Amino acid sequence: MKVALFGGTFNPIHIGHLIMAQYVLNFSQVQKVIFVPNGHPPHKVEDVADAFDRFEMVKLSIEDNPYFDISDFEIKKSNPSWTIDTLEYFSSIYERVYFIIGSDNLSEIVKWYKAEEILKRYPLIVLPRERNLCAIKKEIEKLSSKYAQDITLIQMPVIDISSTEIRKLISQDKSIRYMVHPKVEEYIKRKGLFKR
């Protein structure tokens, strides 16, 4: 089976994440998208919900879609997980593993731990996070020519919604209706998440 890994903090997961994952299913060769919430995001320390809560919110968001799955691989690790470790783990289970990346991270991926190994061994699925398609395509061409890897750009509208904005609205006692799955909205209210 061909799967795509969708890693992220998902703090919280929102409708934009779900739409992006559905576009990956619609316009790539993958048969399943696996959401992989970060356990200990080293670059994000403030206002990050507990890993268990973030995992539960993803689970609630995707439970009615048989083509979406979730993994606690990174959450179960006691230390921050490197992307290469996650990709290698899933490669031992699945026939082909694709890595979903936002176009805003394309120029940064070369600085990641074991970047060359990632770029040589794993095909990328790029989701547009900005509207400048020419710049995105240039970056893809640069990486493709250097690493001779399969990089697919998913042509889709830019989803202009962010977890940061959702947390801000919650802290101001504003509605997040339609921005997250209704079960996630209910979970956030019940647990009192993201209140300052």
Swiss-Prot record:
It comes from the Bacteria. Signal peptide: none annotated. Keywords: ATP-binding, NAD, Nucleotide-binding, Nucleotidyltransferase, Pyridine nucleotide biosynthesis, Transferase. The keyword ATP-binding applies. It is an enzyme of class 2 (transferase). The keyword Methyltransferase does not apply. GO terms for molecular function: ATP binding; nicotinate-nucleotide adenylyltransferase activity. Its EC number is 2.7.7.18. Pathway: Cofactor biosynthesis; NAD(+) biosynthesis; deamido-NAD(+) from nicotinate D-ribonucleotide: step 1/1. It catalyses: nicotinate beta-D-ribonucleotide + ATP + H(+) = deamido-NAD(+) + diphosphate. Pfam families: CTP_transf_like. GO terms for biological process: NAD biosynthetic process. Disulfide bonds: none annotated. Catalyzes the reversible adenylation of nicotinate mononucleotide (NaMN) to nicotinic acid adenine dinucleotide (NaAD). Belongs to the NadD family. This is Probable nicotinate-nucleotide adenylyltransferase. It comes from Caldicellulosiruptor bescii (strain ATCC BAA-1888 / DSM 6725 / KCTC 15123 / Z-1320) (Anaerocellum thermophilum).
